[in-house]
């Protein structure tokens, strides 16, 4: 990379130390390179001029050409006067509005001079208005040369200091004019085959495209490059791991697995479960460590697949463990596994933080001798005193709850690293899985066991609570249980969110004949355990909770999930909460309660929830609505996102294309030392040193 790109931004004419400090703090811009990579978030075509007579209030940004007729200053009773400029283009009159800077505006934009005005038209008292429009002297500017105007994101602090998108645009334009030609950062054969523009052309066109076509060409080139280096790094890392870590060869299927399959399997495996078991078997016979991500919606049978995987380890003379993020989840996994294995001579034990004294000592001793074959627990399994005789398989449930360093400790529990099976009930779209879990092989259970009744999801408004309470009462009288979820534990001053404490009291009055439990994030673990245990044992009929119940709780008798203020939740959260019901044979319901003031995006979320139970469809929609950074678990996944221009949700085809090209490079140069690829490996080193966080995954 040219050394000029490493130049401190303070040396760009017009910036200096003070502006540099603000740009660094607010936008992370410290160098010329940072400014070049601060890409526009949108563009507006400035080559067209509208007449005022053509306008309507539904138009987005438009451009006018005309003269200021006069100014009016209006006293609003506040410190700054409102400034109104009456603007005419010969086809009509519009008002230009400024809430501050009146003296500067009147001095800069003079009556009778012709200007280009650019902004969003609104209507007030039958007249079009433009608030804080962009203004350019029409005599000094050729409209035909303006093309697509870039718009840059700003923080509130920058706006308060008087910065606008145009401020960033001017700095970028100044930098681009002094830049020498930028060197290529992709191999010529990739650039030619994919018909990409050069890096130099892309960087210049992304900030100043003359047309929509130029903008698209620049975006495709820069997005592809960004995704290509992410994929190249992931695939190289995965290849290194496979070469470095041998795996136990488990090619024996014997009495334990066969006995379970023949006599203890509760139902015929679904086609998806059989397919996943074949994939796992192939991994365990390959001689390399298995690193597999098992995705499956709630109730798809992941735990059964995980158990059968552990039984293969037992058949080959090894132990297995399963880790869950909470004690409640660990206890439920233990119960499920013991139910499956009832009547089989297999010792299963639980190890969590609450197992103390002689019982703990006994478990640790029997683990070291191999007497315990399957250990279920929390992160307590990772503690130093926990030593396995021969750990062959480790199953990790809800993987994002375990940090990279924690998972690495598993490898010290055994001579060779154990086979790793990561389970998640949070469906991960394919493009996202390729990026954040790129070094894990992915298996998907996309089929529910037969006989499961799909959950019915209904949308109700908060004015319909009386009839909703009657429906809840009917369900409880049929012997069912109900979850009622509130979004927050305490009301904030700026929000009208229901307070769980007040809501709990209201519900007690509404249902005096029933018993209620209550759990929220501010309670101590022991208190939550007691309240949850009462609900699990059917001692209480209604559980009032915040989202702390969204992962792992298994109460087959609960058939109704009511989510209050559902407009406050993301799609992924709503789907996870819905997954707490529908675990028994009864028809289950999820009721989404909202107010009437719903944004278009919220309506889309509610409609998707009512339309489908398919977690993968919901995850794809969530990714498109919110972007990858908000998806639960991605920030803890181990591959932190630092994408400047690519969008995993919308650029799925480019993700796949980048992965294919990166895979071909690694296939042809597995040692990463071929002279023709020197450019790639040097560029990757540069990226690792600068702004991209390449943490390992599993």
Language-model region placement:
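Long, highly charged, low-complexity intrinsically disordered interaction regions
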Residues: 1-13, 25, 230, 240
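Upstream accessory/linker segments immediately N-terminal to the RecA-like ATPase cores of bacterial MutS
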Residues: 74-264, 668
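Inter-lobe coupling/hinge segments of SF2-like helicase ATPases
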Residues: 275-278, 289-608, 671
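Conserved pre-motif I regulatory segment
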Residues: 21-22, 248-294
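Accessory helical-bundle/CTD segments and flexible terminal tails appended to RecA-like ATPase motors
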Residues: 513, 532-542, 549-556, 561-564, ...
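OB-fold nucleic-acid-binding modules
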Residues: 38-68
